[in-house]
């Protein structure tokens, strides 16, 4: 009896792990969001361009998020190019169909963070693996 319940518990943990992987990396029929580069190191004042490519047409249903260390993700851009309330105008989103960019016109020290794109066109909604932005 004890072995059976342990087996069920381990199996449920495995299913949760697989579900997370499928959300992050896509499964058959899921849209995969691929970000590049994976990381970059920039100096204050430089222009930064991050890219996100969808495995199929997502029209303009793409959002960009910033996640600083030890903080929850913050919405920067929605609908591919709409800046969320309070987001500095140095952040600009563009693109449509499968190719999207997030540009920071003049990077600041406080922009140190991970940046993720996500698509809301087709369920399950999926996200890119992120770009880690470091400041020199």
From Swiss-Prot:
<dbReference type="InterPro" id="IPR013783">
    <property type="entry name" value="Ig-like_fold"/>
</dbReference>
<protein>
    <recommendedName>
        <fullName>Ig kappa chain V-V region MOPC 21</fullName>
    </recommendedName>
</protein>
<keyword id="KW-1064">Adaptive immunity</keyword>
<feature type="region of interest" description="Complementarity-determining-3">
    <location>
        <begin position="118"/>
        <end position="126"/>
    </location>
</feature>
<feature type="region of interest" description="Framework-3">
    <location>
        <begin position="86"/>
        <end position="117"/>
    </location>
</feature>
<dbReference type="InterPro" id="IPR007110">
    <property type="entry name" value="Ig-like_dom"/>
</dbReference>
<feature type="region of interest" description="Framework-1">
    <location>
        <begin position="30"/>
        <end position="52"/>
    </location>
</feature>
<dbReference type="InterPro" id="IPR036179">
    <property type="entry name" value="Ig-like_dom_sf"/>
</dbReference>
<feature type="region of interest" description="Framework-2">
    <location>
        <begin position="64"/>
        <end position="78"/>
    </location>
</feature>
<feature type="region of interest" description="Complementarity-determining-1">
    <location>
        <begin position="53"/>
        <end position="63"/>
    </location>
</feature>
<dbReference type="InterPro" id="IPR050150">
    <property type="entry name" value="IgV_Light_Chain"/>
</dbReference>
<dbReference type="InterPro" id="IPR003599">
    <property type="entry name" value="Ig_sub"/>
</dbReference>
<feature type="region of interest" description="Framework-4">
    <location>
        <begin position="127"/>
        <end position="136"/>
    </location>
</feature>
<feature type="region of interest" description="Complementarity-determining-2">
    <location>
        <begin position="79"/>
        <end position="85"/>
    </location>
</feature>
<keyword id="KW-1280">Immunoglobulin</keyword>
<keyword id="KW-0391">Immunity</keyword>
<dbReference type="GO" id="GO:0019814">
    <property type="term" value="C:immunoglobulin complex"/>
</dbReference>
<dbReference type="InterPro" id="IPR013106">
    <property type="entry name" value="Ig_V-set"/>
</dbReference>
<dbReference type="GO" id="GO:0002250">
    <property type="term" value="P:adaptive immune response"/>
</dbReference>
<feature type="signal peptide">
    <location>
        <begin position="1"/>
        <end position="29"/>
    </location>
</feature>
<dbReference type="GO" id="GO:0006955">
    <property type="term" value="P:immune response"/>
</dbReference>
<dbReference type="Pfam" id="PF07686">
    <property type="entry name" value="V-set"/>
</dbReference>
<keyword id="KW-0732">Signal</keyword>
């Amino acid at each position: 009896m004890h072995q059976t319940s342990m087996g069920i518990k381990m199996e449920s943990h495995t299913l949760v792990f697989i579900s997370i992987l499928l959300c992050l990396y896509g499964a058959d029929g899921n849209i995969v969001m691929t970000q590049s580069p994976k990381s970059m190191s920039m100096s204050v004042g430089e222009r930064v361009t991050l890219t996100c490519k969808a495995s199929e047409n997502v029209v303009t249903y793409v959002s960009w998020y910033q996640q600083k260390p030890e903080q929850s993700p913050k919405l920067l851009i929605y609908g591919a190019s709409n800046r969320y309330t309070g987001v500095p105008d140095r952040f600009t989103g563009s693109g449509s169909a499968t190719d999207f960019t997030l540009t920071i016109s003049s990077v600041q020290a406080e922009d140190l963070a991970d940046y993720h794109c996500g698509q809301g066109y087709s369920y399950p909604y999926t996200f890119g693996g992120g770009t880690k932005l470091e400041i020199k």
